[in-house]
């Protein structure tokens, strides 16, 4: 069984030889940038550099996925947001204190949205990776959800205030922004993406689970209908209160944060959606060593998490030995339990 087959078997609940280790977001690091001579910000904006850096998840770490969209800002750049590109040891960001739009009437998709350098880089990178690894490993695209796009184009505070002051207008905004999600997602599918990650940051730090149900549940169900590949929803933070709703979306999996107990998460989704995660980034992968990483992997596996992954895009200075500890831990866990080839999640 190869990596792509393993990932799809886990998502579909079919028998597979071991739990897959995946990256729904990013495992790009400064160490891998040095190894490939592919540095931020250029590796976010040049397809060849992007593909070279992304492939290290598979070629150097033995992960079962390759995810070339490292950040969360490519389509926002194409929409005209004010960008801060930073250097190799820092993430590019949108200057959300300088929003480009004020309301739903302002939302316009530029004609060059998909030919813009920062969206085209991802589309072309996926094509490169698909030619290099046609059926060996799962290629994971990424398209921002409408809630995340709203933060970028309206600013976080104005957008969240609008959800209280004028919920109907908020829904109009999200419906229009959803079209960007579909447009960029479909372009990646057409280029060869096997799976899409959908980051939509309606996190418990900012909004309640009822907000998710009110504003996003139906939209996310519509995205599942529109986009023809399995979708992995990603939301940072404490999300237990919205997991029952997320389980109703039809998404293939939910990529969840380490702030959620994996046992509780498994109980909460009640078998209605697969879970990916939830190895801690700042405390464990960045600050501790391989033994601590393996302990967290075992905890997630013992809980029944189907796809093991860092909780989010990893810190750029994460050490390779800690990332290598993730697939090593899975191998050890399976070895302790004997045959795994009849496993069905």
Provide a role label for each language-model segment.
Residues 3-26, 31, 64, 94, ...:
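Active-site loop segments of alpha/beta catalytic cores
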Residues 32-72:
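Segments that shape or occlude catalytic/ligand-binding pockets
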Residues 33-35, 79-81, 152-154:
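Short aromatic-enriched loop/helix-cap "lid" or pocket-rim segments at secondary-structure transitions
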Residues 34-40, 100-104, 261, 280:
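Short, solvent-exposed coil/turn linker segments
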Residues 39-54, 101-112, 143-156:
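An N-terminal domain-start capping segment
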Residues 68-78, 141-148:
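Short, glycine/charge-rich beta-strand/loop segments that flank catalytic centers
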Residues 71-112, 136:
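A contiguous, low-structure linker/loop signature
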């Amino acid at each position: 069984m190869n990596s792509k087959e393993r990932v799809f078997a886990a998502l579909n609940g079919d028998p597979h030889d071991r739990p897959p280790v995946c990256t729904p977001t990013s495992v790009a690091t400064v160490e891998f940038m040095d190894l490939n001579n592919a540095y931020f910000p250029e590796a976010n904006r040049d397809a060849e550099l992007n593909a070279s850096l992304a492939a290290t998840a598979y070629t150097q770490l033995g992960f079962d996925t390759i995810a070339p969209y490292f950040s969360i800002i490519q389509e926002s750049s194409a929409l005209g947001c004010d960008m801060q590109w930073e250097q190799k040891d820092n993430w590019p960001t949108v200057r959300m204190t300088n929003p480009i739009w004020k309301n739903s009437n302002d939302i316009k998709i530029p004609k060059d949205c998909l030919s813009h350098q920062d969206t085209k880089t991802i589309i072309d990178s996926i094509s490169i990776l698909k030619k290099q690894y046609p059926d060996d490993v799962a290629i994971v695209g990424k398209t921002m959800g409408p809630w995340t796009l709203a933060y970028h184009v309206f600013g976080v505070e104005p957008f969240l205030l609008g959800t209280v002051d004028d919920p109907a207008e908020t829904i109009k905004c999200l419906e229009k922004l959803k079209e960007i999600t579909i447009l960029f997602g479909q372009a990646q599918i057409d280029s060869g993406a096997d799976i899409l990650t959908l980051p939509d940051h309606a996190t418990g730090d900012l909004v309640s689970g009822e907000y998710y149900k009110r504003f996003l549940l139906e939209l996310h169900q519509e995205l599942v209908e529109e986009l023809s590949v399995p979708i992995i929803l990603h939301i940072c933070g404490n999300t237990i209160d919205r997991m029952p709703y997320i389980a109703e979306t039809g998404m293939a999996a939910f990529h969840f944060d380490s702030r959620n107990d994996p046992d509780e998460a498994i109980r909460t989704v009640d078998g209605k959606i697969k879970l990916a995660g939830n190895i801690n980034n700042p405390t464990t992968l960045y600050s501790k060593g391989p033994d601590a990483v393996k302990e967290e992997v075992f905890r997630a596996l013992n809980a029944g998490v189907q796809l093991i992954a860092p909780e989010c895009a990893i810190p750029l200075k994460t050490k390779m030995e800690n990332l290598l500890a993730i697939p090593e831990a899975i191998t050890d866990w399976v070895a302790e339990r004997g045959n795994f080839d009849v496993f069905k999640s």
